[in-house]
């Protein structure tokens, strides 16, 4: 472990994930083109992305179980091949129905890559570098969004729908070759590989993973932090910027990169904080959620057209939410044995995408409900988006309630099993201040 071979596998795996993110987000920058190509309403258009995410989320637990049974390599090969077929289907789709079928295949293939890669990292690396590598997976992977926002969007604009989606499919072919050639499930001699088991035994292990409070805490952490950015980048961000704010489509696609850059900067910092203060990871999650809530409120309540700097602030906030969601997988890592980590990661990964497709669909419904004139201008009006985007507060607020409950149970189990008491953050900060001020021994902020 932690060898040169480990880094080769990490690099190829991250490239495969980057390509998967590009395939996932390609429909976001194609939203306007899809409206013109298929002549459909906002709700129908959103269903193309929603169905993709439903499939992605529904596949997470089965994929996690299969990773524990047959290994990451087989799942990554099958998933990447599915994405090739899916994007080719979208490229030639004459109707929205066939395009949705293609996106279903993309969602099914995409579902295998990230969870498989997280398991590979835990098999090939050890120590405090693991949570930092998890952040780098998310950060580098999000460069796939840059590929969809810039070269893919330009190709879509210049060469058309079919050429753009066929080109995207060809990149997955390259990733597939790399996976077949280099990815292996575990180091030679390791006993921590896939474990053949009956489905009854696999389901029993899944239930055990799901029952662990730390797994549930990871689920709700992912639920609350990832969804806003996914909804914006995958579906509603481009129509909002182009129609509601009057931004040029090419410039709007470029602005989506702001979120990626913010995530690239924040990810390593969050990785270091996660490794340094493992008992305060939930405080990081809640701080990120609070920050996103504040900047969204500023944007939605701004009188008139919001200024560009405020839009950029929102993009930065949701960009930080991306690496923030990866903290959920660190909860799974520290709460589950390696042989069942695939199942636990699958459960966690459902969270953000479950929130995303519910939020995405409800925003589409809210936009349609306000479009009494039945025009594109009315559909994507600024005031319509204000009310539609407010749906986020309901979904994320529900997630925060369950997150706090799961944290309470996780800390209770930590106290019972390991004798570690985690007090409120403000108490720990006061103790640290007293220690530095020489007034007392203080308590570790962890």
Protein language model features and the residues they cover:
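Juxtamembrane intracellular "pre-TM" segments in multi-pass secondary transporters
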Residues: 1-2, 184-219, 421-438
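Extracytoplasmic gate region of multi-pass secondary transporters
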Residues: 27-28, 213-268, 357-364
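Helix-breaking motifs and short loop linkers at transmembrane-helix boundaries and internal kinks
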Residues: 39, 71, 92-98, 109, ...
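Conserved MFS/SLC helix-loop-helix module at the cytosolic interface between two early adjacent transmembrane helices
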Residues: 58-97
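Helix-to-loop junctions at the C-terminal end of transmembrane segments
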Residues: 59-71, 266-280
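Cytoplasmic membrane-interface "Motif A"-like loop-to-helix N-cap segments
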Residues: 69-79, 275-290
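Cytoplasmic helix-loop-helix junction between adjacent transmembrane helices
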Residues: 102-141
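Helix-loop-helix hairpin linking two adjacent transmembrane segments in secondary transporters
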Residues: 136-187
């Amino acid at each position: 472990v932690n060898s040169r071979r480990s880094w080769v596998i990490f690099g190829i795996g991250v490239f495969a994930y980057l390509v998967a993110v590009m395939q996932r987000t390609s429909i976001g920058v194609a939203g306007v083109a899809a409206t013109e190509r298929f002549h459909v309403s906002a709700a129908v258009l959103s269903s193309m992305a929603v169905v993709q995410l439903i499939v992605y989320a529904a596949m997470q637990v089965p994929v996690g179980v299969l990773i524990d049974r047959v290994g990451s390599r087989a799942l990554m090969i099958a998933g990447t091949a599915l994405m090739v077929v899916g994007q080719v289907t979208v490229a030639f789709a004459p109707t929205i129905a066939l395009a949705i079928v293609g996106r279903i295949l993309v969602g099914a293939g995409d579902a295998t890559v990230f969870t498989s890669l997280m398991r590979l990292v835990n098999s090939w690396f050890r120590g405090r570098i693991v949570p930092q590598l998890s952040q780098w997976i998310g950060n580098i992977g999000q460069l796939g969004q840059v590929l969809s926002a810039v070269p893919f969007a330009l190709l879509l604009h210049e060469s058309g729908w079919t050429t753009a989606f066929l080109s995207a499919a060809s990149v997955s072919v390259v990733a597939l070759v790399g996976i077949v050639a280099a990815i292996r499930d575990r180091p030679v001699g390791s006993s921590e590989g896939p474990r053949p088991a009956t489905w009854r035994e696999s389901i029993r292990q899944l239930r055990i993973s799901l029952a662990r409070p730390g797994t549930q805490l990871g689920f709700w952490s992912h639920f609350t932090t990832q969804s806003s950015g996914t909804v914006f980048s995958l579906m509603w961000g481009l129509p909002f910027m182009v129609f509601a704010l009057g931004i040029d489509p090419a410039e709007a696609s470029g602005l989506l990169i702001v979120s990626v850059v913010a995530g690239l900067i924040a990810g390593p910092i969050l990785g270091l904080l996660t490794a340094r203060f493992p008992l305060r990871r939930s405080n990081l999650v809640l701080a990120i959620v609070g920050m996103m809530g504040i900047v969204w409120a500023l944007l939605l309540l701004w009188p008139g057209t919001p200024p560009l700097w405020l839009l950029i602030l929102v993009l930065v906030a949701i960009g930080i939410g991306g690496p923030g969601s990866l903290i959920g997988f660190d909860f799974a890592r520290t709460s589950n044995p390696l042989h069942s980590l695939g199942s636990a990661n699958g459960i966690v990964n459902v969270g953000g995408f479950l929130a995303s497709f519910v939020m995405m669909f409800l925003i589409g419904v809210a936009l349609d409900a306000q479009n009494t004139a039945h025009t594109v201008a009315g559909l994507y009006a600024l005031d319509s988006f204000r009310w539609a985007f407010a749906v986020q507060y309901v979904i994320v607020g529900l997630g925060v309630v369950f997150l706090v409950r799961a944290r309470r149970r996780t800390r209770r189990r930590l106290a019972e099993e390991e004798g570690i008491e985690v007090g409120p953050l403000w108490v720990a900060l006061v103790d640290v201040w007293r220690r530095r001020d020489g007034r007392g021994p203080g308590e570790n902020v962890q």
